[in-house]
Amino acid sequence: MVSFKYLFLAASALGALAAPVEVEESSWFNETALHEFAERAGTPSSTGWNNGYYYSFWTDNGGTVNYQNGNGGSYSVQWKDTGNFVGGKGWNPGSARTINYSGSFNPSGNAYLTVYGWTTNPLVEYYIVENYGTYNPGNGGTYRGSVYSDGANYNIYTATRYNAPSIEGDKTFTQYWSVRQSKRTGGTVTTANHFNAWAQLGMSLGTHNYQIVATEGYQSSGSSSITVY
């Protein structure tokens, strides 16, 4: 599966009614429209540090997505009829660290829970997918092999994104995927096992940028509450 960050939704404008309306009815319409707009807006995209952890949240502003940082390495996100978003907490820079995480992940539709990060030189977007909804994100990639790590087999895939948004602007870059065959929400992710397996397949990483345990959703609804440590 390729990342959907290059997709953006265009909003349609509603024409005003030509006939006059009662003031009370007009007032109700305006308040309702403003309320629905606020719901659609959700949380704006942002990055930074929170309680000692780096966080990143990106949305294409489709549907409703509410992301909230919590204590320590915790965050929560609720989404409804969303476009595409990805957000979570972790570290900057990333490394071949051992990551522990716990929480809940309840998607309805296409979403996944994943270790997510970027490197530069080469520019690579990578995923170590722990859980997913109705769509296996490896289906859109090229199968390269598998690796056993932390109690399960992970299938390895690559995909190429052309002129797509990245941490360096719109670029062409490669995605690396490890997708866990037995889904879970919580446990240990030994990232070095994946990085080493990728390297043996000729999938080189560069200089690490940020690395988070992320929730990503595409045209779906759901909720997620995750703590990394």
UniProtKB/Swiss-Prot annotation:
Q: Give the main localization category.
A: secreted
The record's Gene Ontology biological-process terms are:
xylan catabolic process
PANTHER family (UniProt xref): ENDO-1,4-BETA-XYLANASE A-RELATED
To which species is this protein native?
Aspergillus clavatus (strain ATCC 1007 / CBS 513.65 / DSM 816 / NCTC 3887 / NRRL 1 / QM 1276 / 107)
Active site as annotated: 125 (nucleophile), 216 (proton donor)
One Gene Ontology cellular component term attached to this UniProt record is:
extracellular region
One Pfam family linked to the record: Glyco_hydro_11
Q: Does the keyword Manganese apply?
A: no
Matching Gene3D superfamilies: 2.60.120.180
Identify the glycosylated residues: 30, 100
Kindly give the InterPro entries that the UniProt entry links to this protein. ConA-like_dom_sf, GH11/12, GH11_AS_1, GH11_AS_2, GH11_dom, Glyco_hydro_11
Its annotated pathway reads:
Glycan degradation; xylan degradation
Ordered alphabetically, the record's keywords are: Carbohydrate metabolism, Glycoprotein, Glycosidase, Hydrolase, Polysaccharide degradation, Secreted, Signal, Xylan degradation
Give the GO molecular function terms: endo-1,4-beta-xylanase activity
Family label? Belongs to the glycosyl hydrolase 11 (cellulase G) family.
**Task of the protein:** Endo-1,4-beta-xylanase involved in the hydrolysis of xylan, a major structural heterogeneous polysaccharide found in plant biomass representing the second most abundant polysaccharide in the biosphere, after cellulose.
Reaction catalyzed: Endohydrolysis of (1->4)-beta-D-xylosidic linkages in xylans
List localization entries: Secreted
Q: What is this protein called?
A: Probable endo-1,4-beta-xylanase A
| Domain GH11, residue spans | 41-229
Record-listed E.C. numbers: 3.2.1.8
Membrane-crossing ranges are: none
Signal peptide start-end: 1-18
